[in-house]
Swiss-Prot record:
Pfam families: Actin. SUPFAM superfamilies: Actin-like ATPase domain. Component of the chromatin structure remodeling complex (RSC), which is involved in transcription regulation and nucleosome positioning. Controls particularly membrane and organelle development genes. Part of the SWI/SNF complex, an ATP-dependent chromatin remodeling complex, required for the positive and negative regulation of gene expression of a large number of genes. It changes chromatin structure by altering DNA-histone contacts within a nucleosome, leading eventually to a change in nucleosome position, thus facilitating or repressing binding of gene-specific transcription factors. This is SWI/SNF and RSC complexes subunit arp42. Keywords: Chromatin regulator, Cytoplasm, Nucleus, Transcription, Transcription regulation. It is found in: Cytoplasm; Nucleus.
Length: 424
């Protein structure tokens, strides 16, 4: 096939990234969450831009087109892809080969649908579907690695050997970002912390100095926040989405992981961290910021007061999930995999997590050399899947792997088997 420029789409659970193969970072990032409301004709009208989706629009439902990393809603997904390509990148997909990333457990039926969407809706001349774990390995300059991806809806461990997935070593569970969010919400309820969403804030609360106390770091009084009037007909999904936004902000700025299994005295001895809620009210958090993150290593630390905070049966600590994956691999592969553990995903950015994981895996794999690798920056971690795809799609020895439109047309009805064979 004649070499043509290529694009990479990484449709993650929280964000969808678009850009040119060969570049170090995506050009455009759109939320995988989307807003949808009916227009006067009854047709769906989608909102996919980050700023617009946070606007309080009456009647707008906020949804996610993916579940467990798998595309479920094709209409909204294609709308997002077309907006990212045609309006944000301002490219014509018919002029570019298209690489799209996928989770290692993507079912055959969805793989077929992705290929059909690329050729029949986007009308690309060439296409390839590549595993996200393989992309992360290449983004970290490795062809063999154990990829530990801690995202929003699940934590997964995937062995990659010589650029190929070892399927029997794939392990995943739902103890990840969303599960922590549910526990954070429960923590706020327990602490009687209530906060208005960002869109209600007209003016934050203000500390008032009346007798010189501000110089000592305190105030005599607080002028409360001013809120905009309630907006009628906002949907419950929008309100939940806005609460999630604040919880995510809290998680990113407050959580820490202890370097040893949770110890109350040790956690209490660490300085508390303050967090300013949207209305300007600040609360300090001590041992609870370690207790929440401990759930990733010890599921019994979950609140377990509702279905959302009860660990699914069979849930294990992250280090145990890693070790299960290692033991499922052939013995000669275990040493190179343990020496090349790569941690990625948004939830992996909690300070101290990688160091704790290394210590816990070392305890399980006594005598083995353990090396846990992380990207140098938060953005490099967040963009690792996309960047790995960018590297792969631009390699000279990859060009013969593209599936051409002519090949696709010649396959006929056996497309599911075809995509399994060509995109491994």
């Amino acid at each position: 096939m004649e070499e043509i420029p290529s694009l990479v789409i990484d449709p993650g659970s929280c964000w969808t990234r678009f850009g040119y193969a060969g570049e170090e970072s995506p050009m455009t990032i759109l939320p995988s969450y989307y807003g949808v409301r009916s227009d006067v004709t009854g047709r769906n009208k989608y909102v996919v831009d980050e700023l617009q989706i946070h606007a309080p629009i009456p009647g707008m439902e906020v949804k996610n087109g993916k579940s467990n990393g798998i595309i479920q809603d094709w209409e909204s997904t294609l709308y997002t892809w077309e907006r990212g390509l045609k309006e944000k990148l301002q490219v014509n997909p018919t002029e570019y080969a298209m690489m799209i990333t996928e989770p290692s457990w993507n079912p055959q039926s969805v793989r077929q649908q992705i290929m059909e969407a690329a050729f029949e809706q986007l009308h690309v001349p060439a296409f390839y579907l590549t595993k996200q774990a393989v992309c992360v390995a290449f983004a970290n300059s490795k062809s063999t690695a154990l990829i530990v991806d801690i995202g929003s809806d699940n934590a997964s461990v995937t062995p990659v050997v010589d650029g190929l997935i070892i399927r029997k070593g794939i392990f995943k569970q739902s103890l990840a970002g969303d599960f922590l969010n549910a526990n954070i919400e429960q923590l706020f309820n327990t602490m009687n912390i209530e906060f208005p969403p960002h869109y209600r804030i007209a003016r934050k609360s203000v500390a008032i100095q009346q007798s010189g106390n501000m110089a000592n770091g305190s105030a005599d009084a607080v002028k409360p926040a001013v809120l905009y009037p309630p907006i009628q007909d906002l949907t419950s999904s929008y309100e939940i989405f806005q609460k999630r936004r604040v919880i995510e902000e809290w998680k990113e700025s407050v959580l820490d992981v202890l370097d040893t299994p949770f110890d109350e005295a040790k956690a209490s001895s660490r300085n508390p961290k303050p967090f300013e809620f949207p209305d300007g009210v600040t609360h300090k958090f001590g041992q609870e910021r370690f207790r929440i993150s401990e759930i990733l290593f010890n599921p019994s630390f979950s609140a377990s007061r509702s279905a959302e905070t009860t660990p699914p049966q069979g849930s294990v600590g992250l280090h145990e999930l890693v070790y299960q994956s290692i033991l499922a691999c052939d013995s000669e592969l275990r040493s190179p995999l343990l020496n090349n553990i790569v941690v990625t995903g948004g939830t992996s950015l909690i300070p101290g997590l990688s160091e704790r994981l290394q210590a816990e895996v070392q305890r399980l794999a006594t005598g083995s050399r353990i090396n846990v690798h992380t990207a140098e920056t938060a953005s490099a971690t967040s963009n690792a899947v996309w960047f790995g795809g960018s590297i792969l799609a631009s390699l000279d020895n990859f060009q013969h792997l593209w599936v051409s439109k002519q090949e696709y047309d010649e396959v006929g009805v056996d497309r599911a088997l075809f995509v399994e064979k060509r995109c491994k």
